[in-house]
Amino acid sequence: MHYKKLVKRHKTQEKQKMEKKWWHHLTAYQIYTRSFCDSNGDGIGDFQGIISKLDYLQELGIGAIWISPFNDSPNYDNGYDISDYYAILKDFGTMADLEEMIQECEKRDIIVMMDLVLNHCSHEHPWFLGACKDRNGKYHDYYIWEEGTEDQPPEGSAAFFGGNVWEWVPQVKEYYYHTFSIQQPDLNWKNENMRQELYAM
């Protein structure tokens, strides 16, 4: 390639790198819904509570809010153990409340970022319940498994919340992998069907 063209292409690439993206010029605010603002007096924060504080956040100059996980969950890890990706935790409100919150944010030019947990799910998720019943079933390969014996787990490091990263399931006589707690089995991203289910969300 001609030298001048190389220089021009390099300058164009550098200019593109220097162009500011939307996240470069605004202030984002993380909201842990459970403790942010309670609208109905039950002691638990909710979407209506967030809505009631949007004018305040706008006055502070907040341009984006990052909402911690709000999907249905048994809450072993503050909502980071999702049992239903298509349902809202009732403590926080309804799907209509969530949609209203998003609409009210849009009116104020506040971007909404949702913390969607895709590394793992809850051990109460229907996929995992199915995976633990049948080694040959559809959902078994949605997770990471290793064979072994009950008294001799595969080699592995410590889980984030302590203990081994491998947990024994007697029904299938295998160990499943969990980076965090035993209630949060890791999803197997090598499985195409599992990936497509997540993409469909």
How does the language model describe each region?
Residues 2, 8, 17-199:
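Acidic/aromatic-lined carbohydrate-recognition and catalytic surfaces
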